[in-house]
Amino acid sequence: MRIIPRTMSTQHPDNAKVPEWAKSEVIEGEDEVKEAFLAYSMYGVHEVMWDAEGKDVDTHVVRKLLSNYPDYFREHILGKDVFLTYRLPNPKVEGADRKVFAETMESIPITYDLAEKFYGNGITVPVFEVILPMTTSNLEIISVARYYEKAVANEDELELYDGVKVKDLVGEIYPKVIEVIPLVEDRDSLQNIDNIVEGYYKVIKPKYMRVFLARSDPAMNYGMITAVLSVKIALSELYKLSESLNFEIYPIIGVGSLPFRGHLSPENYEKVLEEYKGVYTYTIQSAFKYDYDYDKVKSAISSINNSRIGPAKILEKYEEDVLRKITILYTERYQPIIESLANAINDVSVLLPRRRARKLHIGLFGYSRSAGKVSLPRAISFVGSLYSIGIPPELIGISSLSNLDEKEWDIFKQNYVNFKHDLQTAARFFNWESFELIKDIWKISEDTIAKIKEDIDYAESVIGIKLGGIDYDSRKHILMSSLFLLSFKEKILQESKKYLYEMALIRRSLG
């Protein structure tokens, strides 16, 4: 049986600090190849996700890794000891990137040939897994698996002319199959994940399956509590399915450093391991790697790699029904507030520092993530914008919990263990001055302000959260937030950008 990675380094652009080895503030090109090598060699991460979704991708990464760092990769076999996993564009969703999907799939046999030359015959398959984002049905992942088998791996048998086959020209094509990891990002698909996995299992008959649960995008679209509870439902469903099919399922969770995006940081990883029992692989995003002291980062990754994997909590039907009800109540409260703040979020997001050479995510080419009726930036910019205007998104929608009875509240607390801790971590950055300033700048309605005030009042009076600065860093962040809003109002944008960067350094994450 292959090693199932415990940690997966990603290219999420959530870092405030720029690593010393980067040639510029934007990590791109050859720097991303170097970053992949350093993730393995310096940080001890088991797996690197190579992203072809929403950005220009280098499909020659394996060639560059093996030729630039031969000593390391002779000792650590790519595909056996350490892993490289492609994140594809979803051709159903990202129309302009359909051919990038095809190009990335076509590059997999090239990596196989390179490994044959480097390691010798039959030693390893360097790239054998792909991640499909925004998966909503089993048909999508079945189609990806079959596309590779039929359109890529089997093309070597095509006859060109008069008995001459493709393989006579380019050689035989390997691997013959790939493993597809669904990345499930929307609430309904997370809560019905068993249908996606079981459908794929019945058709493809894999020996095991890795399933990627998003934590960041569902938080943006439906609110933090909805995201957490949807992941808990998904983990329970996957565990039950694994038992009933007698088939191993290894969940991956996509978590960032701030509470809204998962709260996996070198300072909080133990609580996240406790929160998401049953998860095999945790994403190590850029803020985790670059915004904390290196020794602390390396030690945290080592601890995650060596931690014990506990079984997921199996939910009884009545518990699951309560959690589903909470996600609906929470989203109904959260989304209208976000829609009202959309102009502010979009205006601030374009001023945040850029950390990756990503294509535009607004307009014809690219995909703005949407919550309800409005378009929003990517989750990192979304979170960074709300923190910067002094309203951490973790607080939005919280008063919907007032609809729970005592039994429902107990079920909620049992299934979101670190709820109060996550909320308190975020609430330190709440800025009381924000209300007047955002009303003035973006003409935010009194109704929206009143709803946010209800949420923060509930957080304070019922949950017992202290809002606002409690130490030097949080007080400085609040001051910077006011200065940012004042400079933005006066259109002194160079100063606005400076304050945004300073706040991100304090948070140890852009968003």
Curated annotation (Swiss-Prot):
Coiled-coil ranges per UniProt: none
Catalytic activity, reaction form: oxaloacetate + phosphate = phosphoenolpyruvate + hydrogencarbonate
Record keywords: Carbon dioxide fixation, Lyase, Magnesium
EC numbers, comma separated: 4.1.1.31
Annotated GO MF terms: magnesium ion binding; phosphoenolpyruvate carboxylase activity
Pfam families: PEPcase_2
Function: Catalyzes the irreversible beta-carboxylation of phosphoenolpyruvate (PEP) to form oxaloacetate (OAA), a four-carbon dicarboxylic acid source for the tricarboxylic acid cycle.
Name the record gives this protein: Phosphoenolpyruvate carboxylase
